Amino acid sequence: MARVKGSVATRKRRKRILKLAKGYYGAKHKLFKTAKEQVMNSYYYAFRDRRQKKRDFRKLWIARINAAARMNGLSYSKLMHGLKLADIEVNRKMLADIAIADAAAFTALAEEAKKALAK
């Protein structure tokens, strides 16, 4: 029978993968092969979703701005165009925050947008 000499490195590699797979469901945190596959998938999901998160937040901000704009008699696109014409530079993140936290300030911005659109 051949002599095995890679036990330390093999054990270290397997322990590292199983440690990364801690908390996974079923065999995915117990068996090396399935744990390794799941860890590789997890890295893929993390990479993909770091980019997806940016899209998701932008969608959320736009939905919030649209809801607040419609309460003030404007659509989202008309509000954004009106703000651009009025030279009011405020990003979607801040605008969504204003819409939730300070309705009066958002109404003032909407009125400015309406004035700019009327010109």
UniProtKB/Swiss-Prot annotation:
Pfam families: Ribosomal_L20. One of its GO terms (biological process) is translation. It comes from the Bacteria. The keyword Ribonucleoprotein applies. Keywords: Ribonucleoprotein, Ribosomal protein, RNA-binding, rRNA-binding. Coiled coil: none annotated. One of its GO terms (cellular component) is ribonucleoprotein complex. GO terms for molecular function: rRNA binding; structural constituent of ribosome. InterPro entries: Ribosomal_bL20, RIBOSOMAL_L20_CS, Ribosomal_protein_bL20_C. Belongs to the bacterial ribosomal protein bL20 family. Binds directly to 23S ribosomal RNA and is necessary for the in vitro assembly process of the 50S ribosomal subunit. It is not involved in the protein synthesizing functions of that subunit. This is Large ribosomal subunit protein bL20. It comes from Lactococcus lactis subsp. lactis (strain IL1403) (Streptococcus lactis).
